[in-house]
Each structure stands twice: as structure tokens, then as C-alpha cells.
């Protein structure tokens, strides 16, 4: 990855909270906790996931950039959503966490030297995992969820009138693991 390519991805990473807020501005209040299908996240849960993922990601970057061959541990994202009862948490606080973690991490990325960019560790699901892999993943992560929010709102608007949330996280039959 060239320094110019990195700069583009760092800017995309920095812009993530604004992208998420733009998607959230299109969500009716009544749609925030609606799930498009059993086992799928609501917009509210997506926002909380982004905060938890960002906290994990910020630490992963630091381990990768500094520690010798760190082990990067995946986590069961659905279990976090269920066990931490994301619907019971404040999505505005989650947005603040996301924003603060990114504002704290962007200068780290901007100041990293070439040696740090070449560092790597081992991800428990993906195997070899480099700082550049991390940047590619997290530069796109929030934008991916912003598109998911748009799809969820479209499904909410297209639902038969009077339909309530479909399913719960308790009924999840699959394991969605960590970026």
C-alpha cells in the first residue's frame, strides 16, 4: 500500500462517524429498534455494535503497531449485542464513543512510520493480519453499517403496516464474529 493509498483510507476512517450520523438522520424514531428479520440487528443495535467494534479495533491497531506478533482475538458480535442488551444502551453515547475512539486513533495512524505499517500479528479467524489489513477493514467498517442502516430503513418502510419487530437476538442461530 502506498502512502497516498493509506492517506485516502485514513481520511475514510476519520469520516466514518459523519457517514454513520448521515445514515441515522434518515431513520424515523419508530424504526430504531425494528429488526428486519429474526437474528438481524436493528439500527439501534448496529450503532452500539459500531462503538464496541471501534473500541476493539482501536486496541487491535495499537497491539499490531507496537507488540511483537500480537494475537488478535475475534469476538462473538451477536453475543455482545444480546448479553450487553444493546437496546438498553444509549445509541447517542455509542456514537460519542465511536467518534472519540476515531479522533484518538487518526493521529496515531497519521504518525506511524513505515516499519509500523509493515507490522503484523495473527488474527484468531483470519490468520496473518497486518496493520494495513486493519486499516482496510476499519476504513470501510462504519460505511458498511451505514448501508445496512439504509437497507433496514427501506425494509421498515416496505413492511406491512402494523408489523412489529421481527425476532430477537435470543433466537440467533448463527455466530457473527469480529472484524
Segments (PLM) and residue ranges:
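Short coil/turn linker and secondary-structure boundary residues
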Residues: 1-4, 27, 41, 89, ...
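Amphipathic, non-membrane alpha-helical segments in soluble helical-bundle scaffolds
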Residues: 3-17, 40-47, 91-95, 132-135
Amino acid at each position: 500500500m502506498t502512502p497516498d493509498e493509506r492517506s485516502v483510507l485514513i481520511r475514510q476512517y476519520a469520516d466514518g462517524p459523519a457517514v454513520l450520523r448521515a445514515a441515522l438522520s434518515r431513520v424515523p424514531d419508530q424504526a430504531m429498534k425494528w429488526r428486519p428479520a429474526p437474528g438481524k440487528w436493528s439500527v439501534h443495535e448496529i450503532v452500539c455494535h459500531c462503538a464496541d467494534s471501534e473500541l476493539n479495533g482501536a486496541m487491535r491497531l495499537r497491539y499490531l503497531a507496537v507488540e511483537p506478533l500480537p494475537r488478535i482475538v475475534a469476538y462473538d458480535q451477536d453475543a455482545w449485542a444480546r448479553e450487553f442488551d444493546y437496546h438498553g444502551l444509549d445509541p447517542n453515547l455509542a456514537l460519542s464513543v465511536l467518534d472519540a475512539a476515531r479522533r484518538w486513533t487518526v493521529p496515531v495512524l497519521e504518525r506511524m512510520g513505515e516499519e509500523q505499517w509493515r507490522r503484523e500479528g495473527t488474527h484468531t479467524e483470519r490468520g496473518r493480519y497486518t496493520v494495513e489489513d486493519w486499516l482496510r477493514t476499519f476504513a470501510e467498517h462504519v460505511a458498511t453499517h451505514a448501508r445496512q442502516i439504509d437497507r433496514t430503513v427501506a425494509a421498515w418502510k416496505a413492511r406491512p403496516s402494523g408489523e412489529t419487530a421481527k425476532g430477537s437476538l435470543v433466537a440467533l442461530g448463527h455466530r457473527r464474529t469480529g472484524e
